[in-house]
């Protein structure tokens, strides 16, 4: 069929060009050549063949690593699984963002899981961006393996941690939070004399000393002092620089920023947690998986790594109860409760 089309075009060309042989032959060759090439090209089948060969070679390579170098294979498989998880989450976040734009849905009106996914993905991608960029060129993922081996906690996000590393690193990060506890409690005690009401001063002093001596506070005791956190000296816009730096460490935010940026970041992050609390109350704590439950407790200040589901649910119910009772102007109390509600909870459940 194609060769017939080439002959037909040749006769038309001879008729139009006349008796000029050289021009006619050149035209015949140019017209025939594309028809000749198009009959033999099979790019799609070649690409699929190459892809299948590459997949087979990769599977053989993975089996070889698993047999000969099991420790390295663990790093390799962790990285590949983590990268796929990250790409899957990126697609899900893209769909959520697209729906927000098309339907005009603000962040605080999203369902809990979508809100939490956006919050966590934003923090993950900031930390993972350098590693992802490094891994794009061919064979550059071997450099990533070196980084995974020597600096997994500092450079990699949770997707690229092994289960053992995840547990170990969460403990390390929480110990970093605990180091800021004394400074935060001392800051609260130093603020007590500046409170105007005598009864409020007594309640605040009693609350702080109880926490310092190992007592876990009740929600009622915390709510009783909420007015102290709506204005000076403990309101969100009245905290001193040292207190804001200590609270930033508890929230895993860098403390090495000017005061106005520390205040802005603390305010935006605790507001984000309040929005998550509202969405979680609608969903219900019982609807969370164990992993979601432990993560929800951890970002609110509790080291939930070694706790049972029941203990996590008890603590999270207390947090949500207090959060639902507070006004927006009292957000500073919720921020301080990352210490007040978490410092002695483990000891209280052991007693």
Curated annotation (Swiss-Prot):
Residues 152-351 are mitochondrial intermembrane. Disulfide bonds: none annotated. Keywords: Membrane, Mitochondrion, Mitochondrion inner membrane, Mitochondrion outer membrane, Nucleus, Transmembrane, Transmembrane helix. GO terms for molecular function: ribosome binding. Its main location: mitochondrion. It holds the Pfam family LETM1_RBD. InterPro entries: LETM1-like_RBD, LETM1/MDM38-like. GO terms for biological process: mitochondrion organization. The chain crosses the membrane at residues 131-151. Residues 172-351 form the Letm1 RBD domain. GO terms for cellular component: mitochondrial inner membrane; mitochondrial outer membrane; nucleus. The keyword Repeat does not apply. Residues 1-130 are cytoplasmic. It is a single-pass membrane protein. It is found in: Mitochondrion outer membrane; Nucleus; Mitochondrion inner membrane. May play an essential role for mitochondrial structure and function. This is LETM1 domain-containing protein 1. The gene is letmd1.
